[in-house]
Amino acid sequence: MKFGKSLSSQIVEMQPEWRDNFLSYKDLKKRLNLISGGAAGERASKRRRVGGATAVTVTAAAAGGMTLEQAGFVGLLDAELDKFNFFFLEKEEEYVIKQKELRERKMASAEEVMRVRKEIVDLHGEMVLLENYSALNYTGLVKILKKYDKRTGSMIRLPFVQKVLQQPFFTTDLLYKLVKECEEMLDQLMPTNEHSVASEDGKDDSEGEEKGSKPSSSSSANGGAVPGEAEAEDERSTDMKSTVTAALRALREIRSGSSTVSVFSLPPLHGSNGQDEPGR
């Protein structure tokens, strides 16, 4: 599957507030198609600078040795970086606060501990999604920059990627640490055999559904919640598991698309129990 289609299918699986914060891959491809290839195309594009362009845009493009179309493309790339960083840092801060709260609550009553355990599983899933968000956007940037260099004969991919490596959205050390701390909390709250089942993304859910059909199990697993609330929580957890599974599958497909390792390759995925979990 081509990257654009893979990214689109991934975005559809995400929660609404995530969707507009992924790489605008289609918009970048449209901008790229406006750029004429080769020296003749560059001369023609330069002649079009005079049209509706502002003096500031013309000056910036000329100073960088770019056509207006090229400057517009790079400007959109920079705007995308700002978008990634804002969303990533906002989510990371949210997860730090939530994890601190859960760490304090896990010492509460037995019923509350069961609810906390469920919330930790959901938080773990969201953080894995954010790791995938980082990796997918990085992959998209590398791919669109490769197309840009090929079309224009420029060599901006390497310097731009070097800049990307310093961006907050790509620096996931703290996030990876939070994921591991979540797993440690689950180890403390969950029996070993139960933990292994809960952590296996993509595994058959029939066993879990069978357990959920027992009234006593449903009640305790949700901290004594009323049936309607319990069903809603179970549905949210199922949706989260499906989304995480789809995210990991999409990322595996992207990584397996090429066996060639280069300076632009994503680092190896960190994982537990043989499962792929991206982190850097």
Swiss-Prot record:
Coiled coil: none
Region spans: Disordered: 191-244, 257-280
Gene inactivation effect: Slightly increased angles of leaf inclination due to longer lamina joint with greater lengths of both adaxial and abaxial sclerenchyma cells. The double mutant spx1 spx2 has abnormally inclinated leaves. Altered leaf inclination phenotypes of the rli1-1 single mutant are suppressed in the triple mutant spx1 spx2 rli1-1.
GO biological process assignments: cellular response to cold; cellular response to phosphate starvation; negative regulation of unidimensional cell growth; regulation of leaf development
Induction: Up-regulated under phosphate (Pi) starvation in lamina joint cells. Up-regulated during cold stress. Up-regulated by the transcription factor PHR2.
Tissues expressing this chain: Predominantly expressed in roots, leaves and seeds. Localized in leaves lamina joints.
Major subcellular site: nucleus
Residue ranges of every copy of the SPX domain listed in the record: 1-162
Database matches in InterPro entries: SPX_dom (IPR004331), SPX_prot (IPR031142)
CC annotations in GO: nucleus
Summary of subunit composition and partner proteins: Interacts (via SPX domain) with PHR2 (via C-terminus). Interacts with RLI1 in the nucleus to prevents its positive regulation of leaf inclination during phosphate (Pi) starvation.
Domain remark in the UniProt entry: The SPX domain is sufficient for inhibition of PHR2 binding to DNA.
Further facts: SPX1 and SPX2 have redundant functions in repressing the activity of PHR2.
Chain's role: Inhibits PHR2 DNA-binding activity via a phosphate (Pi)-dependent protein interaction. Together with SPX1, plays a negative role in the regulation of leaf inclination by preventing RLI1 transcription factor activity in Pi depleted conditions.
Protein name: SPX domain-containing protein 2
Phylogenetic placement of the source organism: Eukaryota, Viridiplantae, Streptophyta, Embryophyta, Tracheophyta
Gene: SPX2
